[in-house]
Amino acid sequence: MNKFSKFCLELSSLSDIKPSIFLSPASGYRARCEFGISKNSYTMVEDGKRIYMDVSKIPHHSIQKIMPKLLKYINESSILKSKLFQINFRSSGSDVLATMIYHKKLKNEWSIEAKVIQAKFKNLSIIGRSKNQKITNDKENVKRICKYKNSSL
């Protein structure tokens, strides 16, 4: 007996509710994701091996759309590229937050360069992080408005 069948059996003694299974989409299902940065590419680790990529099918479509363009701008900027080792993406559906994590203290020139790159996207906010340091040029979170019975939540 699998977990779902066992759960249904246990629930049946408490309620008449019949649970259903809904499959997740095969791509674009992650609103949060983390990528390493190495050799001008995003990286992930699979089976102990580093995989290099420009885009991934796992994140939400809004993140997928931004990934290759942002990577291109990062690789063209020595200020943004220097000592960058990780990027975390968050998405609310349309808006995307990219947190760029560094192995060095960030200077004012980083903030200026990040603003220039951020201005090229209508739905991207960039945060810079380093040890004991956080630089925010715009929003530092993403919000999602959900509709329920003609009300916004």
What are these regions (language model features)?
Residues 1-153:
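Accessory RNA-recognition modules of RNA-modification enzymes
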